[in-house]
């Protein structure tokens, strides 16, 4: 199986939760799974993690590359049909950065409409509810 791992930057407050991403990678590696981390190539507000105040804008794809293991791809360049399942680690960045993203909604909709597995953690579950309400 090929897995798509959706990242929203790097850091719990304005991106993907690093611990959840690393544990996802560890589990996929343990079982020899093929996976591709993806993020959208857009700039969004970031958070100063020392003060929790809004900071400068940062590019989500570039930030996600910090934990992308050299495999990170722009989600606009990915053919969702080539993947068997979607994994969404948590992090507040999902809720903030991808609130109005057409390509992210298209991605999630593809996996759900094709009845492919979608796994979400923590804020990833709330993220899915924004698109699909309680119909999950």
Task: Show where each model-derived region lies.
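Conserved, well-structured core segments that form or line functional sites
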Residues: 115-118
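Short, thiol/selenol-centered motifs that function as redox-active sites or metal-ligating centers
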Residues: 121-122
């Amino acid at each position: 199986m090929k897995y798509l791992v959706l990242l929203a930057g790097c850091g719990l407050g304005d991106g993907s939760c690093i611990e959840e991403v690393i544990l996802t990678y560890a589990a996929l590696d343990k079982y020899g799974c093929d996976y591709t981390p993806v993020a959208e190539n857009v700039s969004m507000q970031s958070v100063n993690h020392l003060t929790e105040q809004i900071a400068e804008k940062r590019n989500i794809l570039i930030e996600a590359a910090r934990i992308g293991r050299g495999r990170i791809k722009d989600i606009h360049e990915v053919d969702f049909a080539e993947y068997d399942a979607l994994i969404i680690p948590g992090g507040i960045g999902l809720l903030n950065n991808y609130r109005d993203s057409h390509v992210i909604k298209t991605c999630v909709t593809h996996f759900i409409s094709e009845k492919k597995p979608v796994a979400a953690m923590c804020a990833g579950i709330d993220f899915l509810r924004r698109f699909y309400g309680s119909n999950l």
